[in-house]
Structure formats: structure tokens, C-alpha cells
């Protein structure tokens, strides 16, 4: 008798520990859904769901062991029902149940489902029992047709996607990323360009200070002087010195 009681207490402790782990996993998942719904991604959600599933699997294995006493054969009876506030009960239930009253006992110590749920379950069981084999086979056949149709649609979409992906990889590349980067660097920052000094060409603009003289008079400048003037900065003060012996070309 004592051995059975010890085994029963050990089983209850293990079940309570698994239930606490399951509760923490569910709370963590609910917290992420409520607070991190904008940043949570699908892999993180699947990881949390896998943790909850592992806790449920472990709890099921504990209850399915042969050493575990059949808990369904035991009945939980309330020893004291009171309308007064119970601090110990609040601490055990983490603030969820402040009073162990007559209104709470049927909900927390219920060994059967709610009456509405139990009625729906009985209706479904009766409906399943009244179903004939021919009707069941027809429904199964129809269900298999729907599943096969959906599977064909998914397979066709997958084949089209694979064909499109393979055709994209076979297209010959007509541009070079390295050449494009060199061209952009040369145009934008002048990278790789060399600066050379040449005389003014026929299409280049020449500053007025070094422009060739007009027919009004004045000495012509050689290309060397023009290049020398191009290399110098123009003076801030402009002077115009004329010779006294210069004759106006139109004074005849």
C-alpha cells in the first residue's frame, strides 16, 4: 500500500512538473503573439509550437506508462468549501482562484465535459453510429478525389516553377558587372582618366585675354603663348596699353 502511494505521489510530481513546463511554453507563445506580432516570423512560431508539442508528448508518455497508476480511477472531493478569501489558494493558483466556493467547485472539479459539449459529442456519436458502410465509403471516396485534385494542382504548379527557374538560369549574360563598375567610377569620379594639356582646338572657347586679335589691330599670339596663358590664372586688374605711333587702319 505504501509503495503504491509513493508511486502515486511521484507520478503526480512528474505530471505537475510537465504541466508547469507546458504552461510556461504556452504563456511564452501567447506573449510573443501579443507583443511581437509585427516582428515574429514563421520559423520562430514553428519553434514555439514544437516546444509545446514536445511537452504534450512527454506528458502523454508519462501517463501511458505501466508504472503510472490509473488516475481516472481516483476521485477528487472537496474537503472544505468556503466563501472566505484563501491566501494559500491564491498562492497555489497564482492569483487565478481567490475563493473556493460552491460556484467554483463544479467547474474546477468537473470530471465530465460541460453539458453543452457533452450533448454535441453524443449527437456526433449517434450520427456516426447511424452511418452505413456504403455512405461512409462514398464520403471517403469523395474526400480522396478532392485531396487528389489538390495534389495535382500543387504538383503542376511546382513543375511550372521548376521549368521557369531552369529557363532563367540558361539565359546568356550580356553584361559585365566589373566593366559597369569601372565605367561608373570613371564617369562619376574620374577614376583611371589621365589629364593631358593640349592647345585649344577649333571648337574650344578661348578666354578674351588670350584670344587672337581682331582686324582692328594688335599682335597675334603664337600657340605656345596661348598654352602658356592657359596655364596662368587671369589677373584681377585688366590693362590696355596702346602705342602712340599706332595708326588706325581706317584713317586714310
Curated annotation (Swiss-Prot):
Pfam families: Med8
Major localisation: nucleus
Cellular compartments annotated: Nucleus
Function: Component of the Mediator complex, a coactivator involved in the regulated transcription of nearly all RNA polymerase II-dependent genes. Mediator functions as a bridge to convey information from gene-specific regulatory proteins to the basal RNA polymerase II transcription machinery. Mediator is recruited to promoters by direct interactions with regulatory proteins and serves as a scaffold for the assembly of a functional preinitiation complex with RNA polymerase II and the general transcription factors. Required for activated transcription of the MtnA and MtnB genes.
Composition-biased stretches (Polar residues): 237-252
Positions of the UniProt region annotated as Disordered: 215-252
Family: Belongs to the Mediator complex subunit 8 family.
Coiled-coil stretches noted in the UniProt entry, renumbered to this chain: 117-142
Protein name: Mediator of RNA polymerase II transcription subunit 8
Subunit and partners: Component of the Mediator complex.
Taxon lineage: Eukaryota, Metazoa, Ecdysozoa, Arthropoda, Hexapoda
InterPro entries: Mediatior_Med8_fun/met
GO MF, any single term: RNA polymerase II cis-regulatory region sequence-specific DNA binding
Keywords: Activator, Coiled coil, Nucleus, Transcription, Transcription regulation
One Gene Ontology cellular component: core mediator complex
GO-annotated biological processes: regulation of transcription by RNA polymerase II
Compositionally biased intervals (Low complexity): 215-224
